[in-house]
Curated annotation (Swiss-Prot):
GO terms for biological process: anaerobic cobalamin biosynthetic process; methylation. The gene is cbiD. This is Cobalt-precorrin-5B C(1)-methyltransferase. The lineage of its organism: Archaea, Thermoproteota, Thermoprotei, Sulfolobales, Sulfolobaceae. NCBIfam families: cbiD. InterPro entries: CbiD, CbiD_sf. GO terms for molecular function: cobalt-precorrin-5B C1-methyltransferase activity. It catalyses: Co-precorrin-5B + S-adenosyl-L-methionine = Co-precorrin-6A + S-adenosyl-L-homocysteine. It comes from Saccharolobus islandicus (strain L.S.2.15 / Lassen #1). Keywords: Cobalamin biosynthesis, Methyltransferase, S-adenosyl-L-methionine, Transferase.
Length: 349
């Protein structure tokens, strides 16, 4: 099978906002309308991003960037992110969400309840992009035209974000959705890791990989996206030990027997968390709150650290049992991280 090396990567809403903010600040301070800007990303890469429009007025400048999703079937592809910049009297950069950016109405998300749904990583990206232009105080307002309408077709309401979309992204880059080509890429990457290690750490996403790198050499870690089950099968045939390291929400799907964790394949996160919490003997009032939560992150806010550890131990043990059911000879380990990067449970390690 030949890998399709021409798969197109995209940019996150956070990267689009950072580019629009930088273009707006250049327009404000230099009275210059850029067609493209280059922004830094949290992973060290620099992205050159097209700018659709720049408007310059007295004391304010606005710029628009279209989100590009690459080969992902993303409803947000082509979405316009608009940022307006004006000077403020401090030396700080103040970022606010305007029309079309959602507000957080439930606890447990990365943004604080009551604030606009702009993740801390995106705020840092915007600040870093602007600081390449000026050290002056700037106020940035991020807007998404028709964001409230588009959000109706996303999962935002289910997690407590209303009135618009979320401005997110951990790397600034959107990788092509998991498919057979990507699975072939995983095979190649596993072979490379095997040249230096007799174990491999499988991490579903960026945050899991980042947290795992505190425990293992980063070169022994592979990010596999949604293809967790396939990746474990591939790895078990060439490595002495396979370690699955992830965050609760993703691994709760595996707990339920969902080994391809793409949303189209099923979702049993809160049901799984409730089931494990019952087995852990959590009090009825806590169980009620968990079942009514809109996200795993929110449910975790109702549990003590010790309760989370107890529940995640049950989850990890069940995952270990499931994996061994289709590969009894595998030397397998499960690590579940809390959302602050602390290890909640280690089973089989």
């Amino acid at each position: 099978m030949i890998i399709n090396s021409l798969k197109r990567f995209g940019i996150t809403t956070g990267a689009a906002a950072s580019a629009a903010a930088k273009a707006a600040v250049i327009g404000l301070l230099n009275r210059e309308k850029r067609n493209t800007v280059v922004i830094p990303t949290p992973i060290g890469l620099r992205l050159e991003i097209p700018v659709e429009k720049v408007e310059i007025d007295s004391g304010i400048a606005c710029a628009e960037v279209k989100k590009f999703s690459g080969d992902n079937p993303d409803i947000l592809d082509g979405l316009v992110i608009r940022c307006c910049a004006k000077l403020n009297e401090s030396n700080e950069i103040v970022i606010v969400g305007g029309k079309g950016v959602g507000k957080v109405t439930r606890s447990g998300l990365k943004a604080t309840m009551g604030e606009t749904a702009i993740s801390p990583t995106v705020r840092d990206m915007v600040i870093n992009a602007i600081r390449e232009v000026t050290d002056k105080g700037i106020q940035i307002t991020i807007e998404v035209p028709n964001g409230d309408i588009i959000a109706e077709n996303t999962l935002n309401k289910m997690v407590g974000i209303v009135g618009g979309i979320s401005i997110l992204g951990t790397t600034g880059i959107e990788t092509p959705v998991s498919d057979d080509d990507y699975l072939e890429h995983i095979k190649c990457e596993l072979n490379v890791i095997r040249q230096s290690y007799d174990f491999v750490v499988i991490a579903p996403g960026n945050s899991a990989a980042k947290y795992a790198s505190k425990l293992f050499d980063s070169n022994s870690i592979i990010k596999v996206g949604d293809r967790i089950g396939d990746s474990i099968k591939l790895a078990s045939s060439v490595f002495r030990k396979v370690i699955l390291a992830g965050l609760p929400a993703k691994l709760l799907k595996v707990y339920a027997g969902i080994f391809n964790t793409h949303y189209s394949q099923g979702d049993a996160r809160l049901e799984s968390l409730t089931h494990a919490s019952v087995l852990a003997g959590l009090p009825y009032d806590v169980l009620t709150k968990i079942t009514n939560a809109l996200s795993v992150e929110e449910a975790f806010t109702y549990m003590t650290k010790e309760q989370r550890r107890k529940v995640m131990k049950i989850v990890a043990e069940k995952i270990l049992s499931r994996i061994k059911s289709f590969n009894g000879d595998i030397n397998f380990c499960v690590i579940i991280f809390d959302y602050d990067s602390e290890s909640l449970s280690r089973v089989g390690c």
